[in-house]
Curated annotation (Swiss-Prot):
Natural source organism: Cellvibrio japonicus (strain Ueda107)
Catalytic activity: uridine(1939) in 23S rRNA + S-adenosyl-L-methionine = 5-methyluridine(1939) in 23S rRNA + S-adenosyl-L-homocysteine + H(+)
Protein name: 23S rRNA (uracil(1939)-C(5))-methyltransferase RlmD
Gene: rlmD
Binding site for S-adenosyl-L-methionine: 310, 339, 344, 360, 387, 409
Top-level taxon of origin: Bacteria
Coiled coil (UniProt feature): none
Taxonomic lineage from the root: Bacteria, Pseudomonadati, Pseudomonadota, Gammaproteobacteria, Cellvibrionales
Length: 485
C-alpha cells in the first residue's frame, strides 16, 4: 500500500492562548498521521494441502521442521532430509503445524510402523523412524539444548541406554467412550484430538497387559447400558498384571460378577476406583490398600498400584546401575538423593555407601520408601519429607555440608529452586558434594539447571540419553557434573 501524505484534517491544530502546550482535541473521525499500514498475512486455511516441503531437521519433539512463507512449520510424521507434502493442522502467528500426506523423497531411516493403529493413535509419535535413528535424534536434542540454553558441551557422551522397542511398557491408562450405536471405544487419544482411537492391541505394552485389552472390551460391551466406566488402568508387576477400573456410578452386581470371572480367567488382580479420588476398593466396594512387587536392581520393592513407577523396567534397571557408577560413592560416603520417590535409586545405593538420605516432597512416597527399607533390613538410610524448593532447614544445610555426592531426579519442571540454592550454598562453602548426577525427563529444564550448576563451579563431564519410551518423542537423559577444584 502506497503511503499518502495526509490532508489538512490530518494535521494537528497549532495551539494558541491559554490552552497552549496541552494535547489538542482531535475529532475521532478525522484522519491521523500514522506510519504506513503493513499488510498482515492472511492465516492459512486449516486442512489446506501444502506444496512440496523440504524437511531441514528435527524439532525438539521429533517432528520435521520446514519453512513456509517465512514461518517455521512443524510437520508430524516427517523425517529430516525428506521431501513431503502435508496438510495444515494449525496456523499460529509465528509458526504453523502440519501432518505428512505424501512422502515424495523418503529417508533411508523411514520404516513401516509396527502398529496398525499408528496413523490415528496419539500414544506413539516416532514409529515411522528406525529405533536407531530415534536414539540419535534424541541424543542430538539433548546435546543441542544444553549447548544452546546452557552454553555447555559434555566432555564425553555416554552410550545410550535402551531396551526392546516393542513390548516394554509396564503401565497404561485407557480411555472409555460409549458411542451412539451402543458400541464401546477403548483406547488412547487420537493425534491432535480429544477423541479416542479404538485399539485392538498396543505394540509397546508388555504382552501380559496387551492380552487384557480384548477381554476388557468384551466386558464393557456386555454391560454398555450402564455407562459407568470412564478409564481402565493396566499395571504389570512380578506378581502378575493388575487392572484398575475407574467408574462414576456404582457397578451393578452382574458387572462385578463378570469382572471377577475375567480376573480369574485372565489371572489378573482387579480393583475399583470410585469417582472422587476415594482410593481403591475391591469388587464388593470395600476399601483396600494393595501392593504389588517391582524388581529394581535385584531388590523386590513393594508399591501401590497407583504409585509413580518407571514404565520401562529394563531401562530402569540399567539407569539405576549407570547412576551408581557415575556417582562412584565410597563405602565411607554420605549421598543425598533428591526427589527420591519410593527409593528407586536410594535403596539400591544403600549397599555401596556408609549412609544415604532420600528426600521427597510427597509424603506417601516417603512412607512407602521407608517401609521398603525396613522390610529389606537396610538400616544405613533414611527418608525425609522435605520442601525441596526451600533449603532453610538447619538439618538440610548440615546434610549438604557433609554429602560427598548428590543425585537429582526431578519432574519435568526440573529443579531450578533447589539447584539455585545448591549454587548459593557452594558459593558460601556450605556444599561439599564433588559429584552430582542429574536424571532428566526434559532436556530444556536440564539445560537451564545445568547452567546454574556451572555457575556453582560444576563442569558437565558426561551426558547420555536413556530410551525409556521407544517410539515416542519423550527424551530421558542422565548427566554427571564434577566440581572443578
Amino acid at each position: 500500500m502506497a503511503y499518502k501524505k495526509p490532508g489538512f484534517l490530518g494535521k494537528k491544530p497549532v495551539p494558541h492562548g491559554k490552552g497552549a502546550g496541552r494535547d489538542p482535541y482531535v475529532r475521532d473521525d478525522s484522519p491521523r498521521l500514522t506510519a504506513p499500514r503493513r499488510e498482515q498475512p492472511q492465516p492459512l486455511q486449516r486442512n489446506k494441502r501444502l506444496g512440496e516441503l523440504l524437511i531441514d531437521r528435527f524439532s525438539h519433539d521429533g517432528r520435521g521442521l520446514a519453512s513456509l512463507d517465512g514461518k517455521t512449520l512443524f510437520v508430524d510424521g516427517a523425517i529430516a532430509g525428506e521431501t513431503v507434502t502435508a496438510r495444515l493442522l494449525e496456523d499460529h502467528p509465528r509458526f504453523a503445524e502440519a501432518r505428512v500426506e505424501d512422502v515424495i523423497l523418503a529417508s533411508p531411516d523411514r520404516v513401516e510402523p509396527p502398529c496398525a493403529h499408528y496413523a490415528t493413535c496419539g500414544g506413539c509419535q516416532l514409529q515411522h523412524l528406525k529405533p536407531e535413528a530415534q536414539l540419535l535424534m534424541k541424543q542430538q536434542v539433548v546435546l543441542e539444548q544444553v549447548h544452546r540454553w546452557g552454553g555447555l558441551t559434555p566432555k564425553r557422551v555416554l552410550p545410550p541406554l535402551r531396551s526392546e522397542s516393542l513390548g516394554y511398557r509396564s503401565r497404561a491408562r485407557l480411555g472409555v467412550w460409549y458411542e451412539a450405536d451402543s458400541s464401546v471405544t477403548l483406547g488412547f487419544r487420537q493425534q491432535q484430538r480429544k477423541t479416542l482411537t479404538n485399539i485392538e492391541s498396543c505394540s509397546v505394552l508388555l504382552p501380559a497387559l496387551n492380552r487384557l485389552i480384548g477381554p476388557l472390551r468384551q466386558w464393557l460391551q456386555a454391560r454398555v447400558a450402564n455407562k459407568a466406566v470412564t478409564h481402565i488402568e493396566l499395571v504389570a508387576a512380578q506378581s502378575g498384571p493388575a487392572v484398575i477400573v475407574r467408574h462414576t456410578k456404582p457397578l451393578v452386581a452382574l458387572q462385578r460378577q463378570a469382572l471377577a470371572e475375567l480376573a480369574q480367567r485372565e489371572s489378573c488382580q482387579v480393583w475399583l476406583e470410585p469417582n472422587g479420588n476415594q482410593g481403591l476398593t475391591d469388587l464388593e466396594g470395600s476399601p483396600v490398600d494393595p501392593h504389588l512387587v517391582l524388581d529394581v536392581a535385584g531388590l523386590p520393592l513393594h508399591f501401590h498400584p497407583q504409585d509413580f513407577t518407571q514404565v520401562n523396567p529394563a531401562v530402569n534397571g540399567r539407569m539405576v546401575q549407570q547412576a551408581l557408577e557415575l556417582l562412584a560413592p565410597g563405602t565411607n560416603d554420605l549421598v543425598l538423593d533428591f526427589f527420591c520417590g519410593m527409593g528407586n535409586f536410594t535403596l539400591p545405593m544403600a549397599s555401596r555407601v556408609a549412609r544415604v538420605i532420600g528426600l521427597e516432597v510427597v509424603e506417601p512416597m516417603v512412607t512407602r520408601a521407608q517401609a521398603n527399607a525396613t522390610r529389606l533390613g537396610l538400616d544405613n538410610l533414611e527418608f525425609l519429607k522435605a520442601d525441596l524448593s526451600q533449603m532453610d532447614s538447619p538439618r538440610l544445610r548440615q546434610l549438604c555440608s557433609q554429602a560427598s555426592a548428590i543425585l537429582l531426579d526431578p519432574p519435568r519442571d526440573g529443579a531450578k529452586e533447589l539447584v539455585t540454592q545448591l549454587r548459593d550454598l557452594r558459593r558460601k562453602g556450605q556444599l561439599s558434594a564433588q559429584r552430582i548426577v542429574y536424571v532428566s525427563c526434559n532436556p530444556a529444564t536440564l539445560a537451564r539447571d545445568a547452567a546454574l550448576l556451572a555457575e556453582a563451579g560444576y563442569g558437565l563431564d558426561a551426558l547420555g540419553v536413556m530410551d525409556m519410551f521407544p517410539h515416542t518423542s519423550h527424551v530421558e537423559s542422565m548427566a554427571l557434573f564434577l566440581y572443578k577444584q
